[in-house]
Swiss-Prot record:
Descriptive protein name: Glycerol-1-phosphate dehydrogenase [NAD(P)+]
Binding site for NAD(+): G97, S98, K99, I100, D101, T119, T120, P121, S122, S128
Annotated substrate binding sites: D124, D171, H255
Provenance organism: Picrophilus torridus (strain ATCC 700027 / DSM 9790 / JCM 10055 / NBRC 100828 / KAW 2/3)
Catalyzed reactions per annotation: sn-glycerol 1-phosphate + NAD(+) = dihydroxyacetone phosphate + NADH + H(+); sn-glycerol 1-phosphate + NADP(+) = dihydroxyacetone phosphate + NADPH + H(+)
Reported cofactor(s): Zn(2+)
Protein's GO biological process: glycerophospholipid metabolic process; phospholipid biosynthetic process
Length: 350
């Protein structure tokens, strides 16, 4: 039998994590920029928090700074239109999840390297080859450029509200249920499965559970701990060639919440709630997850984020519709109102 299988995997070749890591940004850019200018994508707040410091270390380069907003297809198209008469040679994403999603998607479209410079460890997108893009109706996980390098300065990231740290930890912990869903899809639907990616992704989540007592407000070592496991999660996705190792039914619930009305909740908080639902349905120890979230200071009650009871029930009922091709424990049919309400009540989400 002839073997003709081939798979391409891309990983960051340079990773700097720690205090004052941003001082290395100049040498990192020098390594990957072949020609043209540096395109620095950031937000209004993150420009003041980290963008200015990045610029001060890029005096030897021509830099085009773009202040971006939400990661939508329209905003990305608008930025790309503005670049038509410029020679962008590398993209730096400086900020939280949405700014990094915009940067990695533009880098993918332009076919140039991308460097991730996160200002908060709010979710695993800072180290993955996927971008969450909103099209006005729904959120889609799209193929994007894997970071060629990651520069995560813990002295900057620790300044972000602790809420984002806890949410980032929860996003990684929810990998555990994503892997359960992936195994289920492999068993019932014959979906391609990577044991290596699954083990790496689940390990990242369980490592944070075991060390959850170290995830505390104002502690730079907490940033270090969470960011390292975010990198492991990103590597798992690179191995799998998709977001499967880190995105299952918990993420479908999160996206449904975002569509129906997220209140004040952010991605990792939604995934935390979703992971309780998923683990309960899988017959696993959902109370361990709930206690871990409580330990790191993350609330899993929908009303605490302004998410109404009816919104939560509707979100769970329709979550499987968000990405029909991704089979999970939620199945392929809407849950009834009563069943969804019961699951949410048992897990304490409503």
């Amino acid at each position: 039998m002839n073997f003709n299988k081939i798979k391409s995997m891309h990983f960051p070749s340079d990773v700097y994590i720690g205090h004052d890591a941003i001082l290395n940004i100049g040498s990192v850019v020098s390594k990957f920029l072949k020609s043209g200018e540096v395109l620095l994508i950031t937000g209004e707040n993150t420009y003041n928090i980290a963008g200015k410091k990045v610029l001060s270390n890029l005096n030897d380069f021509d830099v085009n700074v773009i202040i971006a907003s939400r990661a939508t297809r329209d905003s990305i198209k608008s930025i790309e239109e503005s670049l038509k008469n410029r020679r962008s040679g590398i993209v730096l994403g400086v900020g939280g999840g949405s700014k990094i999603d915009i940067a990695k998607k533009i880098a993918y479209d332009l076919g140039i390297p991308f460097i991730s410079v996160p200002t908060t460890p709010s979710h695993d997108g800072i180290a993955s080859p996927r971008a969450s893009i909103y099209d006005g109706k729904s959120v889609y996980s799209e193929e994007a450029t894997m970071p060629s390098a990651i520069v995560a300065d813990t002295s900057i990231m620790v300044l972000a509200p602790y809420r984002y740290v806890a949410a980032g930890a929860a996003d990684v912990i929810s990998n555990i249920t994503a892997v359960l869903d992936w195994k289920l899809a492999n068993r019932l639907k014959g979906e391609e499965f990577s044991s290596t990616a699954a083990v790496m992704s689940e390990y990242a989540g369980r490592e944070l559970i075991e060390r959850s007592s170290m995830i505390q407000p104002g502690l730079e070592e907490s940033i270090w701990l969470v960011t390292k496991q975010i990198l492991a999660s990103g590597a798992a996705m690179a191995i799998a060639g998709s977001s499967r190792p880190a995105s299952g039914s918990e993420h479908l619930f999160s996206h449904a919440i975002e569509i129906l009305g997220p209140g004040s909740s952010i991605h990792g908080e939604q995934c935390a709630m979703g992971s309780l639902i998923s683990m309960y349905l899988h017959g696993g120890d959902w109370e361990l997850l709930k206690n871990t979230y409580r330990k790191i200071g993350l609330n899993t009650r929908a009303e605490s984020y302004g998410i109404g009871r009816e919104v939560a029930i509707k979100a769970l009922s329709i979550a499987h519709r968000i990405r029909p091709s991704r089979y999970t424990i939620l199945g392929e049919s809407d849950l009834s109102y009563n069943v969804a309400e019961r699951i949410l009540s048992i897990t304490g989400i409503i």
